[in-house]
Amino acid sequence: MEGILIGDDDALEFYLKYKEDLFKDIPASFFGIYDKKNIERALKYKNVAGVREVESLDQIIELIRKHHKNVENIVFIDNDNRVKNEFEASEDNALKYSNLNFEWIITNDIVSDEFVHELKKVEENSAIISLYPIHFKDVKWLGYDDINKGIKNYTNQIPIYACLSYGITEGVIGGKVINHYNQSKSATEMLLKIINEET
């Protein structure tokens, strides 16, 4: 095996766990990874490179401000608290967005029926940023098409933005999105560079 392309956080976790036993001298490159600790661990190896996945929340919020002047509330919908914790830890965000209210719906903490209830409570002067809302307490995985249909049906024409290119389905405006094709291309180029330097 000449090299390994690693495509998400679970895959990188597996790679790091078994690196010494299975992948010791095999070059690797990752993409679609947002766990900073695992990225730091991986990059300690000389034959590992990669691309961190970073959501462009500032650009999406600016698009909302520009195109939806009535918006006072932004509701983030996400699997877990990772993005929320990073966003709320930034003092810059508190200053930049002092005129906006931010709310979070964390899907891992609720069942799908509760999700519908939370969506019905979203006020008309809101916009939604859909991050990674595909896991619930009672459902391990729902596709973005199903999630976005639900959001659209229960939020009464509130603008919906996404952070992933494949999160743009019917009813979703878009936004400054992450494109995993482009990330994988960059990661592949890095991997080839490592392989070619070693041979």
PLM segments and residue spans:
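Short hydrophobic alpha-helices and adjacent helix-cap/hinge residues
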Residues: 1-199
